[in-house]
């Protein structure tokens, strides 16, 4: 009879430095877990369990939205193509994150590679956002401007920059954690700021009363999305509350869990806001020439996927060539001072 035993959990001083999370003192999985152990650990309360489920369940929600909206009649209308393109990476990024958090304890190398793929999925999501924004959310005065025409191609280039910087940020993480964190934060903040330029401009136009905005009036869901994005960025960078009370939020309530929740809520509100723009502006946009047709959309997506996979492969190859004893793959024991702090 098959008997499954839940993996043993470790404290921070029992795992290599590469696995440490600031302010998280317990609930670590064995750093040489098997794939089965990793899957089983998702049903055990560890410091990663909530991280896994807060992105696994939303994956199915966004997939349901994609299937519901992607009915044959809806899919046949070219006007709806940018929305469907957006939903593809909206399904991908939480799934990639879920897998990264599940299998990151197999080895130091596996941990880095898992997060390389996670970062690549987020970069593609940033590109996916650009398609509906270019199609439905551009300010009226920007329509067919040079910025409008280059918006999606620039977002594709931004995805390469995002993947490259975020993957690179893992290499100096142990020696220069502050620099690594700043680099990774900037890698994701820049594509977000670029993608949302149309919304920021419309918000400026409408500040003080939507009655004067005309076609540039914003849905309240745009505001909720931007608020969730702001909270996500703050939680990702600040590492609160666990940084103020190490060990108190190891299993429930630490910043990465809250970051996941804010991120998926932001994506939900973003989808609702895009649907609102798509519906309210359709009569006006229907007479405008689309910036990208089916062929250009497929080509842009294909090149972006190939380019991001190439970047991930390059960093993975560099990682695999590193000798086993290097600090990035081994780390060192926790200093006595930190051991005393956790007691």
Curated annotation (Swiss-Prot):
GO CC, any one term: plasma membrane
Cytoplasmic side, ranges: 1-49, 101-112, 168-216, 279-291
Compartment(s): Cell membrane
Keyword RNA-binding applies: no
Segments crossing the lipid bilayer: 50-70, 80-100, 113-133, 147-167, 217-237, 258-278, 292-312
Record membrane topology: Multi-pass membrane protein
Major localization class: membrane
One example GO MF annotation: steroid binding
Organism superkingdom: Eukaryota
Extracellular side: 71-79, 134-146, 238-257, 313-343
UniProt xrefs under Pfam families: HlyIII
Record keywords, A-Z: Cell membrane, Lipid-binding, Membrane, Receptor, Steroid-binding, Transmembrane, Transmembrane helix
Entry function: Plasma membrane progesterone (P4) receptor coupled to G proteins. Seems to act through a G(s) mediated pathway. Involved in neurosteroid inhibition of apoptosis. May be involved in regulating rapid P4 signaling in the nervous system. Also binds dehydroepiandrosterone (DHEA), pregnanolone, pregnenolone and allopregnanolone.
Annotated PANTHER family: ADIPOR/PROGESTIN RECEPTOR-RELATED, MEMBRANE PROGESTIN RECEPTOR DELTA
Family: Belongs to the ADIPOR family.
Additional observations: Non-classical progesterone receptors involved in extranuclear signaling are classified in 2 groups: the class II progestin and adipoQ receptor (PAQR) family (also called mPRs) (PAQR5, PAQR6, PAQR7, PAQR8 and PAQR9) and the b5-like heme/steroid-binding protein family (also called MAPRs) (PGRMC1, PGRMC2, NENF and CYB5D2).
Self-association and partners: Homodimer.
Protein name (record): Membrane progestin receptor delta
Native organism: Mus musculus (Mouse)
Protein encoded by which gene: Paqr6
């Amino acid at each position: 009879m098959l008997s499954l035993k839940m993996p043993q959990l470790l404290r921070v001083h029992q795992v290599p430095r590469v696995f440490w999370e600031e302010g998280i003192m317990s609930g670590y999985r064995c750093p040489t877990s098997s794939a089965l152990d990793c899957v089983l650990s998702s049903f055990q309360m560890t410091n990663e369990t909530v991280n896994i489920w807060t992105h696994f369940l939303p994956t199915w929600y966004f997939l349901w939205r994609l299937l519901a909206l992607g009915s044959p009649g809806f899919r046949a209308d070219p006007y709806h193509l940018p929305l469907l393109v957006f939903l593809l990476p909206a399904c991908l990024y939480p799934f990639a994150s879920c897998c990264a958090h599940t299998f990151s304890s197999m080895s130091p190398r596996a941990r880095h590679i898992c997060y390389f793929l996670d970062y690549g999925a987020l970069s593609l999501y940033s590109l996916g956002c650009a398609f509906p924004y270019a199609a439905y959310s551009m300010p009226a005065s920007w329509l067919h401007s040079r910025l409008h025409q280059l918006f999606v191609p620039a977002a594709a280039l931004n995805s390469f920059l995002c993947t490259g910087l975020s993957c690179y940020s893992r290499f100096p993480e142990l020696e220069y954690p502050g620099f690594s964190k700043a680099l990774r934060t900037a890698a994701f903040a820049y594509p977000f700021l670029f993608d949302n330029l149309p919304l920021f401009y419309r918000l400026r136009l409408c500040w003080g009363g939507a009655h004067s905005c005309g076609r540039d009036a914003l849905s309240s869901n745009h505001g909720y999305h931007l608020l969730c994005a702001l909270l996500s960025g703050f939680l990702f960078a600040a590492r609160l509350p666990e940084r103020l009370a190490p060990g108190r939020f190891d299993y429930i309530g630490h910043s990465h869990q809250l970051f996941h929740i804010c991120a998926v809520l932001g994506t939900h509100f973003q989808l609702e806001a895009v649907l609102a723009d798509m519906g309210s502006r359709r009569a006006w946009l229907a007479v405008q020439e689309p910036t990208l047709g089916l062929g250009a959309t497929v080509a842009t997506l294909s090149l972006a996927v190939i380019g991001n996979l190439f970047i991930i492969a390059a960093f993975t190859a560099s990682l695999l060539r590193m000798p086993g004893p290097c600090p990035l793959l081994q780390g060192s024991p926790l200093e006595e001072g930190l051991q005393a702090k956790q007691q």
